[in-house]
Each structure stands twice: as structure tokens, then as C-alpha cells.
Amino acid sequence: MAESVERLQQRVEELERELAQERSRRALGSGDGGGGRARIEKMSSEVVDSNPYSRLMALKRMGIVSDYEKIRTFTVAIVGVGGVGSVTAEMLTRCGIGKLLLFDYDKVELANMNRLFFQPHQAGLSKVQAAEHTLRNINPDVLFEVHNYNITTVENFEHFMNRISNGGLEEGKPVDLVLSCVDNFEARMTINTACNELGQTWMESGVSENAVSGHIQLIIPGESACFACAPPLVVAANIDEKTLKREGVCAASLPTTMGVVAGILVQNVLKFLLNFGTVSFYLGYNAMQDFFPTMSMKPNPQCDDRNCRKQQKEYKKKVAALPKQEVIQEEGEIIHEDNEWGIELVSEISEEELKKSSGPIPDLPEGIIVAYTVPQKQEDSVPEVTVEDSGESLEDLMAKMKNI
């Protein structure tokens, strides 16, 4: 009880300070949006202590990004403002993104304090409200739109679809990118369903239950595998993830892993939006071996999501409509023009032997090939040996053997 009273007193003091700051700003007529500074209309590369964008604009001078100011024209929606999502939102805010849409239904708890960003005095507030308050103070140039609800319910799903398709920097325009920073399969599938239906590009992220590995994945509907194309093992095995949760047992959580995953996620977002570097379709992280595997996955033609299959057909039509570029094959340079000794390269096995050593190739979906085939077992043919009957009796044969 005493802790609750103390927490409420701290919250009252915080609100009183905010009120005093707001009254002071209005009295001075500064017109700033929070954070103790006026809004900056245009990014500048001027190197002065009062310019929060000077080091970001230095990327242009160093030839990394051609037009960094373009970042202020983009809108990003973040679903899940927890360990990864809150840090992702903070990084994008510091980078000067144009607009952020935040979706989460949960509240800040003291158990969240190990996952960066949130502060103890914010316990009890909704995560989106606490995040918006902190982020506005960090960068008042960014526009924020927060929604405190669960996107997996039927009524909220329609509103979620509406906001990602109309909540861009210019109202009525779609967002440029959706980031999934949720921690359960149901929410990921909800985002996947919405983005497949709208043809919306999105990035998925996650941290393992033991907190020592994570990943990010870029999903372009029709072009790359969606989340339903290759479901996690726990889902493929028909296991209800709700039954995995036990009372008094929770998943591990490391702020270091959360920070690394959020960092590579935002890095991929910046490369995708500002068109520099190589954008990874899948990038993993294993803290135990410091291993960062990368790969790309083609969509599954037999995906359970009908909108995914529809997007695949549209993507194939788009690719087929592109003008075909003629591939000019360059002849390899001849190292030795003359062959004085008549040397020839001969295969170790003939084509007939190669066919016998290979088995039948199974019928697989497009894009999947077998590494090897199992040859069919052939029964060893034993030549028949016939012996002519000599006509001698068994006693005569035994007598001959004794004389040998």
C-alpha cells in the first residue's frame, strides 16, 4: 500500500513539472513541441552544439547517404512497444523519422525495467503513452500517433488495417513500413494477414525465449516468404503456445540482446528507406557464438494465406512485364592455345554410370531442389552355375576323396 501511495506521489510530481514546463513555454510563446527546444523545420549540416542533426547529416558528406533529409518524409508503424519495440522507436526518433505510429495494449511494469527505455516512475502507464511522452522530449520534430489496444481482436483489427493504410505523414496515404516487435505468434500472424491483404512491406523481429539469440526479417508480399509460408516449429507441430506458459515461469530477457536486435532492425530500416548498403531479407544473431547468419526465402506457392498466393501471382506478372535484358556471354580466355601432346579431359564416370547412381527426382514446389537423390536398390545378379551329373554313386565319390 505504501509503495502505491509513493508511486502516485511521484506521478503527481512528474505531472506538476510537466504542467509548469508547458505554462512556461506558452508564456514565452516559443511554440516548441516539447523537449525544451523549438521544432526544426529543416535539417541542417551546420556543425554547432545546438544542432541535433549535424552528425546524422555527416553521412552525406562521407558519401554513405545521398539525401538524408528524406527521412523526414517517411512514416513507420511499430507494433509492440516492449524490449525491442521501445528501443526501436527511440532510435528512429533520434534519427529524425517523420512520423511514428505505436501500437500496444500492455502497461509498464517494474518487471520491464531490465529491458531499457522505460523508467520506474512510469509503472502503471500504458506503454504507448509512456513511450510517446519520453520520445516527444527526445525529438519534438517527430509526429506521433499512439493506439492502446490489442490488434488481434476482430474490432481492433479493422482499425489497425485502416491506420496502416491511411496513417501516413499525409493523411490518407499508407505508412512506408510496418515493424513487428511483438512476442507471440498470434500477433505476428495478425500483422502478416493485414500486410498480405494490403500489399504492405514489413519487417519482423524476435528474440528467443532464452534471450541469447534473435533475428530480423524483411517481408515483401509476393516477393519474399511471408510469416505463414514457413511457420515456426512450435506451430508446425500443432502445439498451442498458450499451453507452454506455466505459472511462475517466464521467458528470459537480456537488455543486451534486445538492444542488438533493435539496432540491426533499425539499421535495416534506414538502409531500406534511404536506399544505401545491402538490405537483409533475414539476419540472425547468436550471442553464444557471435554468429550473424543471413539468407533469403522465396514465398511458398502453397501458402495457407490466400492473399499471399494472390500477391505472388501479381509479382510474377510484374516481373514478366519487365523488359528482358539480353545476357551477353563472354568467351573465356584461352590459356593454352596449342595442345602439343593431345591432352584431353575425360570424366571419371560415364553418363550411363551417372544415371545408375542417381535415383528419381521427387515432385517439389517451385524454388526447392534436392541436394542428392537416393539410387534405387538393385538386386545382385548371381550367375547360375550348373554341374553335369557324373553318374557315380556317393560311395565311389567318398572312396576317391580318401585316396587323395
Swiss-Prot record:
BP terms from Gene Ontology: erythrocyte differentiation; megakaryocyte differentiation; protein K69-linked ufmylation; protein ufmylation; regulation of intracellular estrogen receptor signaling pathway; response to endoplasmic reticulum stress; reticulophagy
Keyword Cell inner membrane appears in the UniProt entry: no
Catalytic site positions: C250
Motif placement: UFC1-binding sequence (UFC): 389-404
Motif UFM1-interacting sequence (UIS): positions: 334-346
The organism's place on the tree of life at top rank: Eukaryota
Modified residues (Phosphoserine): S45, S358, S393
Keyword S-adenosyl-L-methionine (UniProt): no
GO cellular component: cytoplasm; cytosol; endoplasmic reticulum membrane; Golgi apparatus; nucleus
Binding site for Zn(2+): C226, C229, C303, C308
Keywords associated with the record: ATP-binding, Cytoplasm, Endoplasmic reticulum, Golgi apparatus, Membrane, Metal-binding, Nucleotide-binding, Nucleus, Phosphoprotein, Ubl conjugation pathway, Zinc
Region ranges (Linker): 347-377
Recorded GO MF terms: ATP binding; protein homodimerization activity; UFM1 activating enzyme activity; zinc ion binding
Compartment(s) of residence: Cytoplasm; Nucleus; Endoplasmic reticulum membrane; Golgi apparatus
Sequence positions that bind ATP: G83, D104, K127, N150, N184
Domain comment as written in the entry: The UFC1-binding sequence (UFC) motif mediates interaction with UFC1.
Quaternary structure note: Homodimer; homodimerization is required for UFM1 activation. Interacts (via UIS motif) with UFM1; binds UFM1 via a trans-binding mechanism in which UFM1 interacts with distinct sites in both subunits of the UBA5 homodimer. Interacts (via C-terminus) with UFC1. Interacts (via UIS motif) with GABARAPL2 and, with lower affinity, with GABARAP and GABARAPL1.
Record function comment: E1-like enzyme which specifically catalyzes the first step in ufmylation. Activates UFM1 by first adenylating its C-terminal glycine residue with ATP, and thereafter linking this residue to the side chain of a cysteine residue in E1, yielding a UFM1-E1 thioester and free AMP. Activates UFM1 via a trans-binding mechanism, in which UFM1 interacts with distinct sites in both subunits of the UBA5 homodimer. Trans-binding also promotes stabilization of the UBA5 homodimer, and enhances ATP-binding. Transfer of UFM1 from UBA5 to the E2-like enzyme UFC1 also takes place using a trans mechanism.
Family: Belongs to the ubiquitin-activating E1 family. UBA5 subfamily.
Name of the featured protein: Ubiquitin-like modifier-activating enzyme 5
Organism classification: Eukaryota, Metazoa, Chordata, Craniata, Vertebrata
Gene name of the encoded protein: UBA5
